[in-house]
């Protein structure tokens, strides 16, 4: 089967392109819009798995993709967190922990790239990303887009777990930079 050599990059770009549509659906006061926004967020989140999987499996890894993929993840998660903070009752603490870690780690990754140190993505970091995206999917849908009474609470609990893992996984980047302090 022939795969377009840019497919992983197209998936990453699609993840970024989905952000304004997800935000728009959140501002439409309709359960259907909330369901559509949550579905679109889930699909955008799934591209995070497939872009990397396809790139590695078919040897389509590019410097552009390696640079853009983590940016797309942070944009998707960050924009949705900011949207939720502005328009819902989501707890600020796990959201701010996640945002702070993502900004710090982005800076540390840039520094580590300058000194030619690579920090591989751990299984725990992949679990963290999955839980962040799962929690945010639930919170985007929320009780306004579903008849499930405790859906917001479930989303918040998962978000707290993701925030805890966010701090733990961020430590590996600080550890890699320690000898440069």
Swiss-Prot record:
Any one of the GO BP annotations: phosphatidylglycerol biosynthetic process
Annotated EC: 2.7.8.5
Record-annotated membrane-spanning stretches: 8-28, 35-55, 64-84, 148-168
GO molecular function: CDP-diacylglycerol-glycerol-3-phosphate 3-phosphatidyltransferase activity
Biochemical pathway: Phospholipid metabolism; phosphatidylglycerol biosynthesis; phosphatidylglycerol from CDP-diacylglycerol: step 1/2
Domain of life per record: Bacteria
Keywords of the record: Cell membrane, Lipid biosynthesis, Lipid metabolism, Membrane, Phospholipid biosynthesis, Phospholipid metabolism, Transferase, Transmembrane, Transmembrane helix
Entry GO terms, CC: plasma membrane
Bilayer topology annotation: Multi-pass membrane protein
Enzyme class: transferase
Catalytically driven reaction(s): a CDP-1,2-diacyl-sn-glycerol + sn-glycerol 3-phosphate = a 1,2-diacyl-sn-glycero-3-phospho-(1'-sn-glycero-3'-phosphate) + CMP + H(+)
Role this protein plays: This protein catalyzes the committed step to the synthesis of the acidic phospholipids.
Cross-referenced NCBIfam families: pgsA
Protein's name according to its UniProt entry: CDP-diacylglycerol--glycerol-3-phosphate 3-phosphatidyltransferase
Annotated organism of origin: Rickettsia bellii (strain RML369-C)
